Amino acid sequence: MNLHEYQAKQLFAEFGLPVPEGYACDTPQEAFEAAGRISTAKKVVKCQVHAGGRGKAGGVELHDTKEGVKEFAQKWLGKNLVTYQTDANGQPVTKILVEEASNIANELYLGAVVDRATRKVVFMASTEGGVEIEKVAEETPELIHKAAIDPLVGPQAYQGRELAFKLGLQGDQIKQFVKIFMGLGEMFTQYDLALLEINPLVITGEGNLLCLDGKINIDSNALYRQPKLREMHDPSQEDKREAHAAQWELNYVALDGNVGCMVNGAGLAMGTMDIVNLHGGKPANFLDVGGGATKERVAEAFKIILSDDNVKAVLVNIFGGIVRCDMIAEGIIGAVKEVGVSVPVVVRLEGTNADLGRKVLAESGLDIIAAESLTDAAQKVVAAAEGK
């Protein structure tokens, strides 16, 4: 689960990290009033969406007057912001962050992520703030400095000092950086984070450190024990189909192809997408129905897949390990009848009772195309999607 910038800064402030004075606003009038409470001559206004690239898309502006701030809010609230990280429809803007402008002398990067290679939380710091860390890692990896956190003892002040030295900080800046580092380390563990970034972490004209932006991603598997963070969830930023899938414990990711895929098992689902692509098709989604592929879940999976108007054919690829293929076949038949599927459906069954499952499908009287192998299934569904 992702947080908005204003929510990330609220958490930063909770742990004593320096953030600009700012207010999240729901209406143009609130934005106008918030601008009046900010003492700096210039105010920064930012659209709050779960996507980067807001500045280049016009979603971040600098204004001298309260009226200018209000006009910005009127322009964007209720609209969609399209950036290079969103799809063509963009993300809806339901809040505007109005905050004081900062006097920036230099920009740094500070972030933390769960590193599966070391099985530790790893902090990353760089002098190349304000740009994507992935770009820095690709072009100048030597400019990224790391500190792995021992889970038994947590972040240590000496690690923060080492990073501060490598960033070229001096004097009181080192103490400020260590405080930020320790606060983020505590926050990462306490709130079950998967990733956090301050980009940029700026050095102001007065020589102080300031968290100018914030990005936080929470481990969704831990949300059951994070009631405070659950309340910060913004469903408007999620794909409606993905949200629907989550309610049924289906793993769904929307893509831009025309072949719907329904598979049990994440690895098999990825392999299915690969072979569809290999035979000239384009997957419209990733969908893993998991081990409990009941009639109800299969029906919901069909509904989700077919809610995408781009889908011209559906490939159902099931390996019967724990579940029996004949039961899956009955679920598919029931789901097709209930949903009223109007596009070609190709089904490949393998594993426990696969022959019986294929027989059940053949005797159903429905227009379901049986496939003998994964290659056969991919070829048939690609042809069906092309109307052949």
UniProtKB/Swiss-Prot annotation:
One of its GO terms (biological process) is succinyl-CoA metabolic process. Binds 1 Mg(2+) ion per subunit. The keyword Magnesium applies. Substrate binds at N264, G321, I322, V323. Mg(2+) binds at N199, D213. Its EC number is 6.2.1.5. It catalyses: succinate + ATP + CoA = succinyl-CoA + ADP + phosphate; GTP + succinate + CoA = succinyl-CoA + GDP + phosphate. Keywords: ATP-binding, Ligase, Magnesium, Metal-binding, Nucleotide-binding, Tricarboxylic acid cycle. Pfam families: ATP-grasp_2, Ligase_CoA. GO terms for molecular function: ATP binding; magnesium ion binding; succinate-CoA ligase (ADP-forming) activity; succinate-CoA ligase (GDP-forming) activity. Coiled coil: none annotated. InterPro entries: ATP-grasp (IPR011761), ATP-grasp_succ-CoA_synth-type (IPR013650), ATP_grasp_subdomain_1 (IPR013815), Succ-CoA_synthase_bsu_CS (IPR017866), SUCC_ACL_C (IPR005811), Succ_CoA_ligase-like_bsu (IPR005809), Succinyl-CoA_synth-like (IPR016102). Residues 9-244 form the ATP-grasp domain. SUPFAM superfamilies: Glutathione synthetase ATP-binding domain-like, Succinyl-CoA synthetase domains. ATP binds at K46, G53, R54, G55, E99, S102, E107. Its cofactor is Mg(2+). One of its GO terms (cellular component) is cytosol. Succinyl-CoA synthetase functions in the citric acid cycle (TCA), coupling the hydrolysis of succinyl-CoA to the synthesis of either ATP or GTP and thus represents the only step of substrate-level phosphorylation in the TCA. The beta subunit provides nucleotide specificity of the enzyme and binds the substrate succinate, while the binding sites for coenzyme A and phosphate are found in the alpha subunit. PANTHER family: SUCCINATE--COA LIGASE [GDP-FORMING] SUBUNIT BETA, MITOCHONDRIAL, SUCCINYL-COA SYNTHETASE BETA CHAIN. Heterotetramer of two alpha and two beta subunits. Belongs to the succinate/malate CoA ligase beta subunit family. This is Succinate--CoA ligase [ADP-forming] subunit beta.
